[in-house]
């Protein structure tokens, strides 16, 4: 399962943007299985999802995203092939992985340009809307204020624009600037 998940996330091109290997986002999915129904091949899990962003001209990274998904539940059998199309969401596991891939890429792009991840985050929202039919928890609108729907819906809400700008100012104008001018970077972080 681990190898299948790694291949699915790392071998797929999630956007049309071109990145070098060293520009890839470092993220971790720490999935803890609490129950396995072998008759139906259903894994009941929780997942700690973390993503780090490199700081320009340094060996340092900063945490971009850190969240526990208490409802990381999916169906998987040993030789299942993971296939994903945005237009038709029919597999819980690929939907989960795609959701977090789009969310993390969108957050990362937001940290490099003001609302730079808007298009990718909209794709994440579309995926979430298309996943409303799943019988698995974590997708339903308004069922929980910390589920996947709530996270992406709230992040795209216009009221969150100041927070999104704060992310950009903190990372791009603050941390990244410190390689060129420590004082200016520190000032920008203090002002955010």
Residue ranges with predicted function:
Residues 1-44, 55-57:
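Start-of-domain marker
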Residues 6, 21-24, 65-67, 83-92, ...:
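Surface-exposed peri-terminal alpha-helical interaction modules
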Residues 17, 68, 75-79, 158, ...:
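Generic signature of intrinsically disordered, low-complexity segments enriched in small/polar residues
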Residues 39-149:
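Acidic/His-rich structured neighborhood in mature extracellular/periplasmic domains
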């Amino acid at each position: 399962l681990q190898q299948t998940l790694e291949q699915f996330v790392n071998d797929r091109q999630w956007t049309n943007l071109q990145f070098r290997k060293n520009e890839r986002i470092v993220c971790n999915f720490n999935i803890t299985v609490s129950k396995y129904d072998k008759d139906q091949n259903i894994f009941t899990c929780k997942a700690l999802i973390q993503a780090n962003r490199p700081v320009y001209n340094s060996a340092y990274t900063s945490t971009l995203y850190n969240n526990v998904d208490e409802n990381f539940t999916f169906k998987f059998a040993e030789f299942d092939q993971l296939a994903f199309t945005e237009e038709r969401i029919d597999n819980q596991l690929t939907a989960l992985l795609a959701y977090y891939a789009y969310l993390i890429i969108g957050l990362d792009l937001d940290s490099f340009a003001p609302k730079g991840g808007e298009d990718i985050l909209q794709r994440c929202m579309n995926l979430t809307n298309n996943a409303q039919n799943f019988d698995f928890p974590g997708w339903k609108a308004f069922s929980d204020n910390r589920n996947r729907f709530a996270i992406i819906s709230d992040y795209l809400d216009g009221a969150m624009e100041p927070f999104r700008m704060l992310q950009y100012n903190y990372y791009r104008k603050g941390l990244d600037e410190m390689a060129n001018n420590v004082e200016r970077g520190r000032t920008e972080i203090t002002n955010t």
